Amino acid sequence: MNAVSMTVIGAGSYGTALAIAFARNGHHVLLWGYNPQHVRELQIHRCNQAFLPDVQFPDNLSPEASLETAITASRNILIAVPSHVFHQVLYNIQPYLNQHSRIIWATKGLEHGTGRLLQEVAREILGDKIPLAIFSGPTFAKELAIGLPTAITVAASNAEFSEELQQLFHCDKSFRVYKNPDMIGVQLGGVIKNVIAIGAGISDGMGFGANARIALITRGLAEISRLGIAMGAELSTFMGMTGLGDLVLTCTDNQSRNRRFGILLGQGMDIEEAEKQIGQIVEGYLNTKEVRMLARRIGVEMPITEQIYHVLYSGKSVVEAANTLLSRTLKDEIHDKVCF
């Protein structure tokens, strides 16, 4: 078998889908999961019965239980784990990295407890010499895994790395890869859209209709853009795949856990029961606190995020939160050519 082109760390639905997509493109891929029993089941059944039971693994996708073997087998390490364990995963893989290693992640989140960008976390743990990149964009795991047409964006710490990843993983038949040099913007778009999607779900669960949903999406995009610009991101990034594209997808399609979680809250279900019914990690719930923390630290107003935070963490009712948003002081939509 050919040399390993990519090791994927994280055998959940999204990590598995990415591994399948890369393998389908002719690359030898290793897929590592933290649970040895789960990895053994992947090896036996040649599919991920827990998350993607109907999608068989290509022959060149190899589940791997040894973290050392997985990391040392390839220079390209793609991390696809929930954001709250991203920090620990980097610490775990760091001893096995070498001067040729390169780190990519598809995790959409901020560091738990600090609100830091994952780029900052990676630099702190891994140092300045290892190239870093992000895969982000409007993708649902199942559609990616079964080979439906999908587009994604890569942002990297240097142009050469970005170009190589684009060429490595682009597939004319189903998987289109765009480049974007704006690492900050690409990260923020992928994080905050999950928070806004909870709000869109709450609105739909309350029966507010399509008008309210699109208002939340539009003003949510304004919040993402405000914070991004304040942190040095490019406005154009938020008009692209990792901004507007990912936001619209996550706010409007019921494959989104964040949207479904919000719908349940809007229908009156409590948070614990809604989490249980979703059955998988809801990144927007985990990251609302961190996004609010980051916005307050930077000094950026994010009223939708603020109200979602109070619903999730302060016991505010969804009705009260909606009334608070609707009764805010009237203002201009456009300021300095930006939708603020």
UniProtKB/Swiss-Prot annotation:
Active site: 193 (proton acceptor)
Molecular-function annotations in GO: glycerol-3-phosphate dehydrogenase [NAD(P)+] activity; NAD binding
Subcellular location as annotated: Cytoplasm
Location, primary (coarse class): cytoplasm
Cited PROSITE patterns: NAD_G3PDH
Known catalytic reactions: sn-glycerol 3-phosphate + NAD(+) = dihydroxyacetone phosphate + NADH + H(+); sn-glycerol 3-phosphate + NADP(+) = dihydroxyacetone phosphate + NADPH + H(+)
Binding site for sn-glycerol 3-phosphate: 108, 137, 139, 193, 246, 256-258
Family according to the record: Belongs to the NAD-dependent glycerol-3-phosphate dehydrogenase family.
Function field: Catalyzes the reduction of the glycolytic intermediate dihydroxyacetone phosphate (DHAP) to sn-glycerol 3-phosphate (G3P), the key precursor for phospholipid synthesis.
Name recorded for this polypeptide: Glycerol-3-phosphate dehydrogenase [NAD(P)+]
Species annotation: Bartonella quintana (strain Toulouse)
Gene that produces this protein: gpsA
